[in-house]
A protein has these predicted regions:
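Extracytoplasmic
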Residues: 33-35, 95-99, 115-116, 133-138, ...
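Extracytoplasmic/luminal low-complexity segments enriched in Pro/Gly and acidic/polar residues
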Residues: 198-238
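Flexible glycine-/small-residue-rich
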Residues: 40-42, 104-108, 132, 143, ...
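Extracytoplasmic segments of membrane-associated envelope/inner-membrane machinery
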Residues: 103-177
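Structured, soluble extracytoplasmic/luminal domains of envelope-associated proteins
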Residues: 77-126, 225-227
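Periplasmic/extracytosolic POTRA-like scaffold domains at the N-termini of outer-membrane
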Residues: 42-85, 132-154, 205, 212-216
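Short beta-strands and strand-coil junctions in structured, solvent-facing domains, enriched
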Residues: 88-89, 99, 109-111, 128, ...
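N-terminal membrane-targeting segments
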Residues: 1-68
Length: 238
């Protein structure tokens, strides 16, 4: 009989725990978020002020404050925030202490196209507007920049981004109407003619070899132009 009562007591305690857990979970889901915390990932300067994110949330404030956690559409909030032209991704989630957390990844510019109007090209190769909050110190692009050749420019920018030497020293790109590319570097007054992107890796190798040799011989200031268009050679014009 005692064994039977202990068995009944064990079942009762288990059911009580399940009930209390379900009751607590139900009450928690029935609550609205206690706080909203906005976090910008990384240490980069902000292209979008936190107040701009607040404005987007204010547009949804009544929804956020009135809707309980169990029906809060986090994906819809993510979509609203991610739609901002300076934001690449946004992750919205509920924290264990009852708050709403927003993690934001900003778009990252690779270069600034100097035109009217000027704009950035981001790491995805997409046009990105300038920011009123911060002006990025990035490589400048001049010349005939169009929707049809922005992919060519992006490929050149990524080649620079992925090369330790060019990432430090390259300052300007120029593209003409025939999509021929030229480049300028930080400590050289001469123009570097790259041409098209055929054999680009080899052209970069050739230029770095030329640069090191000319620098060693103190000849960098003597050149007006360096042409990388020719196969397996660098032509320097003084």
């Amino acid at each position: 009989m005692r064994k039977y009562l202990n068995y009944i007591k064990g079942i009762f305690m288990l059911l009580l725990v399940v009930f209390l857990f379900a009751f607590s979970s139900s009450r928690n889901n029935a609550r609205t978020p206690d706080s909203i915390n906005i976090n910008f990932n990384g240490e980069n300067p902000l292209f979008i002020a936190e107040s701009n994110v607040d404005k987007m949330l204010i547009q949804n404030q009544e929804y956020i404050e009135c809707v309980t956690k169990d029906v809060l559409d986090l994906k819809a909030l993510e979509s609203t925030i991610s739609s901002h032209e300076m934001i690449e991704t946004a992750e919205v989630y509920l924290t264990v202490d009852g708050g709403l957390k927003i993690d934001i990844e900003q778009r990252k510019p690779l270069a600034r196209v100097v035109s009217d109007p000027s704009f950035y090209i981001d790491r995805q190769g997409q046009p990105m507007p300038l920011s009123d909050a911060y002006s990025a110190r990035v490589l400048l692009v001049y010349g005939n920049v169009t929707n049809s050749n922005i992919e060519i420019i992006y490929q050149m920018l990524m080649a620079i981004e992925n090369d330790a030497f060019l990432k430090i020293y390259a300052t300007d790109l120029i593209i003409d109407a025939q999509n021929q590319i030229s480049m300028r570097t930080r400590d050289c007054s001469f123009e570097i003619l790259i041409g098209d992107l055929n054999r680009l890796d080899q052209k970069i190798i050739n230029f770095k070899a030329f640069y090191q040799k000319a620098k060693k011989d103190s000849l960098l200031k003597d050149y007006k132009q360096v042409n990388l268009k020719f196969n397996q050679q660098v032509v320097g014009i003084k």
